[in-house]
Amino acid sequence: GWSHGDDEIFSMEEMKRYFDPNHISKSCSTFNQTKLEWLNAHYIKNSDDDELVLQLVEFGVDIRSHAKKHLIAQQYKQRAKTLVEMAEGIKILLNRPSCYDEKAYKKFVTESSLSLLAKFADTLSANLNAKECEERTMEFLDANGAKLKDLAQPLRVAITGGSVSPSIFEICEILGSDEVKTRISNLIKKGL
């Protein structure tokens, strides 16, 4: 194996500068999948958004012409360990759920959450950015005597089909109010 002291993360320029074949040890190197994923996640998080958007095409996700492509890249690169994970998350976001994660559905979808979602959908207006969506959501929750936990997870289930996603407010900005309303309506139609 080879190392440069305790350093683990290098730019290409640093790697070229520091690497010396004379410093390769005779002991066997080991492969550590967890460390590789950690390192890969670091490079994804620090990648240029436009470069990531181009790389995602190879993984079946073409958001090059999406109006919110940079916001999508920014949200998903913070969570992904691999480009495959990033692409899968974006695919889930951009496609309406055809089914819902059973565990998330049972845990978060109730009569009261469906009622709250229906009222919330009526308050959504076009062209909200994430900050405005968050402010309006908090006003809505205050007016209805509810807490964010009462709305966020059921809304996440409606939008993505599951209980894991980036910020719900960022997701609402990416999809737009009409699409969010449609997804809420689809969940309500499914019912309990």
Role assignments for model-derived ranges:
Residues 1-6, 45-50, 84, 88, ...:
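Short helix-capping/linker segments at secondary-structure and domain boundaries
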Residues 26-32, 64-72, 142-150, 163:
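Structural motif
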Residues 1-63:
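A conserved active-site cap/scaffold subdomain adjacent to cofactor or substrate pockets
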Residues 48-144:
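Small-residue-rich helix-loop
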Residues 13, 33-37, 70, 74, ...:
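Non-catalytic, well-ordered alpha-helical scaffold segments
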Residues 18, 38-42, 74-81, 153-158:
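Short, hydrophobic/amphipathic alpha-helical patches that form generic packing surfaces
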Residues 128-192:
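Charged substrate- and nucleic-acid-binding regions of tRNA-handling and nucleotidyl-transfer enzymes
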